[in-house]
Design a protein with these regions (language model features):
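Primarily recognizes the serine-hydrolase "nucleophile elbow" in alpha/beta-hydrolase
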Residues: 141-145, 150-198
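Conserved alpha/beta-hydrolase "acid-adjacent" motif
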Residues: 271-280
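Accessory cap/linker subdomain of secreted extracellular hydrolases
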Residues: 113, 125, 179-257
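N-terminal cap/lid segment of alpha/beta-hydrolase-fold proteins
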Residues: 18-50
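Short, surface-exposed "cap/lid" segments of acyl-processing enzymes
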Residues: 48-88, 100, 104
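Short beta-strand/loop motif that positions the catalytic acidic residue
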Residues: 258, 264-266
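Alpha/beta-hydrolase active-site loop
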Residues: 105-145
Length: 299
């Protein structure tokens, strides 16, 4: 996995009180929407009246709070220094549906992965459509609350946020710059197929075993497509609703047409999110003479 961006960035701190938006430098805002329910977002309060660039961060997958209490202090799903960012940007964060701003999160002692009980609202609502529509509404609202430079409205999407950011570019004319990190070029389903083919090529499994696995994957994909709005059925830790919505997106189709500057970061050694899709996107844009996308591969 992309080492530079750890899932949790541990902040050694003396804070013993419960974290809240104010103590971390944010102003909370709740948007009430008939379709999406409550959209909870936060914008930095530092120099809110000063004209400067705006940065909307779109985090990765999972029902995790933005800030997470741990034994050694607290962690965050934010992969950059907030204090530094707030000097130059109006920073904007969005909670996923039903997920609190901060809460205690356990970590599996063997794998180190976070363990957190999924809120019911998250289960019922989380989809690509929810995240993209919520982000679009937040951008429209926050640009009325802070003095944002309309020529410098950026998004930073990581992992699942890569997909969200890509889809947002197809909808919102407010975004002027984008950084998209560790995401897919094709549908997310294709990564599972690529992974098995690569394991066969590398000799980890036989080609026959790979084909059996891939045939099983196609069976699952058909089941998801047959019940695309189900929040009762799960696969790989996510509802069918979540999978069907995100798998419907093929980022290369959008990114190969965008005109704004986009900086793509690809993790070349990531086995879960294949770099091949972004390699294809890079080739496609270069053949088309597109110059707005920069491609940055990292181990």
């Amino acid at each position: 996995m992309f080492r530079f961006l750890a899932l949790l960035i541990v902040c050694n701190t003396g804070l013993s009180a419960q974290l809240n938006p104010d103590k971390t430098g944010f102003i909370p805002v709740t948007l009430k929407d008939q379709k999406l329910g409550n959209i909870q977002y936060y914008h930095s309060k530092k120099d809110a009246e000063s004209k400067k660039a705006l940065l909307l961060y779109l985090d990765g997958s999972g029902p995790y709070p933005i800030f997470q209490y741990m034994a050694q202090g607290y962690g965050s799903t934010i992969p950059f220094d907030l204090k530094k960012a707030m000097k130059d940007f109006h920073v904007v964060l969005i909670s996923k549906p039903g997920v609190p701003f901060a809460d205690s999160v356990r970590r599996d002692p063997e794998t180190g992965y976070p363990e957190y009980r999924e809120p019911q609202e998250y289960t019922q609502r989380l989809s690509l459509d929810w995240r993209v529509e919520a982000a679009e509404k937040v951008l429209r609202d926050v640009t009325k609350r802070v003095n944002a430079d309309r020529n410098k409205i950026s998004i930073l999407g990581f992992s699942e946020g890569f997909q969200v950011g890509t889809a947002l570019l197809a909808r919102s004319k407010l975004v002027t710059h984008a950084v998209l990190m560790v995401g897919n070029g094709f549908t997310q389903f294709f990564d599972f197929i690529i992974q098995n083919r690569q394991e066969a090529i590398c000799g980890k499994i036989t080609h026959q075993e790979a084909q059996i696995r891939i045939d099983s994957l196609h069976k699952v994909f058909r089941e998801i497509r047959a019940d695309p709005t189900s929040t009762e059925k799960h696969w790989f830790g996510h509802t069918y609703l979540r999978w069907s919505s995100f798998a419907s997106l093929e980022p290369f189709k959008i990114l190969s047409r965008v005109k704004i500057p986009v900086y793509l970061v690809a993790a070349t050694a990531d086995e879960n999110t294949s770099v091949l899709g972004l390699d294809y996107l890079r080739l496609k844009t270069e053949l088309a003479g597109q110059t707005s996308i920069r491609f940055h591969p990292v181990p």
